[in-house]
Amino acid sequence: MLSVAREGLSMNEKAELRKIWMEREAGLSENYITESNAGIIRNLFSLQEFQCAETVLFFYSIWSEPDTHEMIRRALDLGKTAALPKTYPKGVMAARKIGGFDELKPSRFDIPEPDESAPAIDPDALDFIVVPSVAFDREGYRLGHGAGYYDRYLALTRAFTCGIAREKMLAPRVPRERHDIRVNCVVTENEILRWRN
């Protein structure tokens, strides 16, 4: 069973749920990953909110996550300001401007991120945030990786928030807490789901 409707799961139960979804992601075919990447990028770039955005916070995709590397390249080619998260202890992150991937350095999680010297971008200066997850549901809530970085950060900004997910990684419902913030939309390769927050 890949969705859990009840609230207030323990840390162990959430960890088990993440494991189930990550195993599902690991089993996706290369063909499907390539095709869905193209569809997700197409739908993301079709959003009026994205087209109008001047400053966009992306995340650096790893493993079988939807490909943000091509998104970042295209955004830079369009003249947008692109940013990536810089992580700090205690679940704190900041948006820092990037001009290319050669500027990045491995974080303590081994995920490339901007150097401390990269220009910081205030949360209120962001127009659009591409939000990661282990899984999104059809109500705009996410099962994150468990560190709480985005839970804290999204509470600081008024930017338009957009989750990206493969259709096969959409859950009917993920567990949620009172502090969880729903994204404004979720983009898959096949559809764009929107909510009024």
Regions found by a protein language model. Give the residues of each.
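N-terminal active-site beta-alpha-beta segment that forms phosphate/nucleotide-binding
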Residues: 8-125
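Short glycine-rich anion-binding loops that position phosphate/pyrophosphate groups of nucleotides
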Residues: 62-64, 134-138
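Short capping loops/turns at secondary-structure boundaries
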Residues: 119, 142-143
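A structured binding-face within diverse protein domains that lines the active/interaction site
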Residues: 112, 132-134
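Surface-exposed, charge/polar-rich loops and edge strands
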Residues: 4-16, 23-30, 124-129, 137-141, ...
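Redox-cofactor binding/interface segments in oxidoreductases and associated redox assembly factors
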Residues: 58-60, 131-132, 188
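Short polar/charged helix/loop
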Residues: 146
